[in-house]
């Protein structure tokens, strides 16, 4: 069996740790971006309803209470159902 020399072993470990760190950093940035978008969606939909906009054309894009576009909002993707304060994951079958 081929045995690595010490310098080669250090190079392999260094390369692996670099790629692991890079992948982890990308995953963290991606997760934070997703959370930021979700919070933004929830904030926009909440303010659209709080402003008392009853016109369908006015709050069609931001209202999480309308049944037509509720499934595209971050509240559904995060499992936050209307009228429920508990956190639940949506079940897909």
Swiss-Prot record:
Alphabetical keyword list: Cell membrane, Membrane, Transmembrane, Transmembrane helix
Membrane topology type: Single-pass membrane protein
GO cellular component: plasma membrane
Cell compartment(s), UniProt: Cell membrane
Segments of this protein annotated with the region Disordered: 47-66
Main location: membrane
Recorded phenotype for the gene knockout or disruption: Not essential, it can be deleted.
Domain of life, source organism: Bacteria
Keyword Transmembrane helix: yes
Membrane-spanning segments: 12-32
NCBIfam families: MPN313
Protein name: Uncharacterized protein MG220
Native organism: Mycoplasma genitalium (strain ATCC 33530 / DSM 19775 / NCTC 10195 / G37) (Mycoplasmoides genitalium)
């Amino acid at each position: 069996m081929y045995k690595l020399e010490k310098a080669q072993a250090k190079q392999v470990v260094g390369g692996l740790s670099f790629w692991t760190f890079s992948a982890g950093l990308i995953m963290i940035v991606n997760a934070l971006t997703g959370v930021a978008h979700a919070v933004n969606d929830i904030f926009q939909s909440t303010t659209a309803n709080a402003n008392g906009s009853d016109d369908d054309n006015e709050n069609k894009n931001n209202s999480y209470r309308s049944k037509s576009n509720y499934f595209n909002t971050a509240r559904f993707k995060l499992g936050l159902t209307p009228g429920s304060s508990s956190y639940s994951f949506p079940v897909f079958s």
